[in-house]
Amino acid sequence: MNSNQHILDELYQVILSRKGASPDSSYTASLLHKGVDKILKKVGEEATEVVIAGKGGTDTELIYETADLLYHGLVLLAARDIPADAVWSELQRRFGTSGIVEKAARKE
């Protein structure tokens, strides 16, 4: 098992610990203090940067921007009081299921 596999859980726990912190104490606390609309703006910006890096950027740029997108997605989950485990469970549920079959099941 790669020691990096738990980093998203660890990061999410740090994000949760910043929810009640002073906005001056960290970028995460500041973002959470500004609310969901500001976080959504950042998620949108980061998603756009992933697309740009994926289209014409280097591998390093794509990795960097994807990390930013994952981080801001976790901040959004924390702001909405959604446990990161809910996402991991959804990914597990989908694992091994054809994307076509899974998408068709959502339409029912």
UniProtKB/Swiss-Prot annotation:
Primary residence: cytoplasm
EC numbers: 3.6.1.31
Record localization: Cytoplasm
CDD domains the record matches: NTP-PPase_HisIE_like (cd11534)
Tagged with keyword Ribonucleoprotein: no
Biological processes per GO annotation: L-histidine biosynthetic process
UniProt keyword list: Amino-acid biosynthesis, ATP-binding, Cytoplasm, Histidine biosynthesis, Hydrolase, Nucleotide-binding
Pfam families cross-referenced by the UniProt entry: PRA-PH
Gene Ontology MF terms in the entry: ATP binding; phosphoribosyl-ATP diphosphatase activity
Catalytic activity: 1-(5-phospho-beta-D-ribosyl)-ATP + H2O = 1-(5-phospho-beta-D-ribosyl)-5'-AMP + diphosphate + H(+)
Family: Belongs to the PRA-PH family.
Database matches in PANTHER family: HISTIDINE BIOSYNTHESIS BIFUNCTIONAL PROTEIN, HISTIDINE BIOSYNTHESIS BIFUNCTIONAL PROTEIN HISIE
Protein name: Phosphoribosyl-ATP pyrophosphatase
